[in-house]
Amino acid sequence: MSLKRNIRRLDSIVPTAGREGSDIQFNLYKGRGVAVFTSGGDSQGMNGAVHSVVRMGIYLGCKVCFINEGYQGMVDGGDNIVEASWNSGSDIIQKGGTIIGSARCTDLRQREGRMKAAYNLIEKGITNLVVIGGDGSLIGANQFRKDWPGLVKELVDTKKITPEAAKSYPNIQIVGLVGSIDNDFCGTDMTIGTDSALQRIIESIDAVVATAQSHQRAFVVEVMGRHCGYLALVAALACEADFCFIPEWPPPVNWREILCKKLQEMRAEGQRLNIIVVAEDDDRDGTPISSDLVKDVVAKTLKYDTRVTVLGHVQRGGSPSAFDRLLGCRMGAEAVLALMEMNEESEPCVISIMVTRWYVPLMQCVERTKAVQKAMSEKDWELAVKLRGRSFQRNLETYKLLTKLRTVEKDNLSGGQNFNVAVMNVGAPAGGMNAAVRSFVRMAIVPSLYSLRYEDSFEGLANGAFKKFQWGDVTNWVMHGGSFLGTQKQLPNEKNVPLIAEQLRKHNIQALLLVGGFEAYHSTLILSKNREKYPEFCIPLCVIPCTISNNVPGTSISLGSDTAINEICTMIDKIKQSATGTKRRVFIIETMGGYCGYLATLSALASGADNAYIFEEKFTVEISLRRGSHRCKMAQGVQRYLIVRNEYANKNFTTEFVKQLFAEEGKGEFSTRINILGHAQQGGSPTPFDRNMGTKLAARALEYIITQIKESMVNGVVSTKSPERATLLGLTGRRVVFTPVEELAAETDFDKRLPCDQWWLKLRPLLRILAKHTSIYHTEAMEDTEDYD
């Protein structure tokens, strides 16, 4: 029987399913019009959405317009509403802010202002709007839509437009993209800009940690978020903060005593610094808890050298993260398609996306968002946390557990029993490995489990290189890349399997967690199949996929892949800058990934590359050159051409061969250069996404392992031969799923080390469209209502 356990979010907003797999033809909506504008506060990733709206709209045959300066530009009209060309979307995806400007507009709140806006849109022939902004911008758009028929009638009555024009524009259609660093809008997993803001926060805190350790200081870091504590909470998890203040879960009245006691305990454990994260506008019973107040409490009570760092608008700035670039691109494309398919009865919707995308009713999301604010104003904190969603709840629960210092006598998971659980890294190092190990260790210590580590993978295990973990052993592990345990690619084999079994028996290991890549998955499969011969392997085994290649079956995303894509995008941005100076140059960039083209495809899409050569999609010399798009780009626009090639895309068409091909083709017209990015792609400091995913997956893995240990216990001995006790913990869609590795074996190409089914291949048509290749595009829709947490 297949084992796929997951946690369902029963109270989630139910979306309307789209048309996954349907074909969208070139020039399908020729003659239609679309306008895009950004409103309210800016956020990183908005330009990616603008880039995608322009190019998808033009691909579909639409006339696409920019409305500069947000709603104010719509009211003022004139040169603020301009037609966009294909090149309008060039070289903007890596830029922060919004190239078309944004402004807060009071005129639109008045009927006279809305009348002017309606007139200007009719004059330009625009009735389809893509709104990129926060909840205020989206609510304003919905009100504008409701008033539209009356506004048009009044324009006819005052003879500002003709009755014929009124008949041509009887209604207006609106699709919203939520652009906000706060991530405070219900109905979408992540808003555009949130991931980038988290990266700015973590970069700042990581920098602060160095000086804090040097001087044994305490730092109070104030972050943005308005009335939402998402940024503060997730940042606290990602930087191992000692304390966190968020508006959804304010501390008790005696928070001063609790805070100081916690900081003293951490110093007593040998920690040289303390980090406290404070969300702006955090309050308890109407009394604000400011960063300065927290600083004064610590400094006066504990006499610690305490400093305040207010990050401010730094959080909005800088280049967007790869996640936000991809988010903007995919949302923008889907927004145009949604507009084209709307009719008079269609209500405004919001494009929501995580691994899949779907449409959710705008006002349903707005009402849910208002319900959170109402719960907080009524001091119903439990309801406020619940309404934020299961992901927010899980973040809060994990934070509470990981910041506990003292072991509780009895835990509801272990039932007060002591179990021996071990953890090891297998495969190549990747961002998030250390975060996963830290989380597993500390979550194990809380219920009084004995947590052991095996160093240097199976080589170390066979040689007995183990150590029992203590709480302080994993302090500050989250912020570091690589693997502190040491990791090797060696698989269990005939020589070392007996030694591995002996060590597991010697240390009475009752469960084993492997954090690593394809090798970790394959190793677990080998151990599982050797259970008949070695009873020491008849224990719960679990794998957390952690590899930059994202080539492990049973999961959509592997730990470390987000860090790698961000590193690749950063390097490509610098290469593009070089090309901007030299002009008329083709760059061929080689990425890692083995035979898996995930890194090449997603980094190409996130960096605005023109093509990506991968093993999964065959290419030839004729295909590479016949489009002639590289010649067109040299003659106009940015005058460069960028190709991302996966390292094993084709054994004959190597990176050097492709370079020589383009060099010969471009004699006298353009030059060609190659860049092999190498091991720099494994990244330095892990991204917040990888840190927190590793933290939460390891916590979930431990919960599941403890349950399996108790279910497999017979007369005090753990023994199980069930395939369902050797699992891989992965993300499929929006679900966290434990899948037996023996079941996954049927879905694996072991020769090429690839899953047989890879979701991201559906992004290939979008990559080609945005790079000006005529292609068929496949829309995606959510298949379920379950939530990754």
UniProtKB/Swiss-Prot annotation:
Question: Any idea which positions bind Mg(2+)?
Answer: D135
The free-text function statement in the UniProt record for this protein reads: Catalyzes the phosphorylation of D-fructose 6-phosphate to fructose 1,6-bisphosphate by ATP, the first committing step of glycolysis.
Locate the residues binding substrate.
S180, I181, D182, R217, M224, G225, R226, E280, R307, H313, V314, Q315, R316
Q: What processes does the entry annotate via GO biological process terms?
A: canonical glycolysis; fructose 1,6-bisphosphate metabolic process; fructose 6-phosphate metabolic process
Q: Which GO terms describe its molecular function?
A: 6-phosphofructokinase activity; AMP binding; ATP binding; fructose-6-phosphate binding; identical protein binding; metal ion binding; monosaccharide binding
Q: Which organism is it from?
A: Haemonchus contortus
Q: Which GO terms describe its cellular component?
A: 6-phosphofructokinase complex
Family label: Belongs to the phosphofructokinase type A (PFKA) family. ATP-dependent PFK group I subfamily. Eukaryotic two domain clade 'E' sub-subfamily.
Q: HAMAP family in the record, alphabetically?
A: Phosphofructokinase_I_E
Matching SUPFAM superfamilies: Phosphofructokinase
Its Enzyme Commission number(s) read: 2.7.1.11
Name of the gene this protein is made from = PFK
Q: Which Pfam families match?
A: PFK
Q: Does the keyword Flavoprotein apply?
A: no
Which Gene3D superfamilies does this chain map to? 3.40.50.450, Phosphofructokinase domain (3.40.50.460)
Q: Which reaction does it catalyse?
A: beta-D-fructose 6-phosphate + ATP = beta-D-fructose 1,6-bisphosphate + ADP + H(+)
Record note on quaternary structure: Homotetramer.
Q: What is this protein called?
A: ATP-dependent 6-phosphofructokinase
Q: Which residues does the annotation say bind ATP?
A: G41, R104, C105, G134, D135, G136, S137
Instruction: Kindly list the organism's lineage.
Output: Eukaryota, Metazoa, Ecdysozoa, Nematoda, Chromadorea
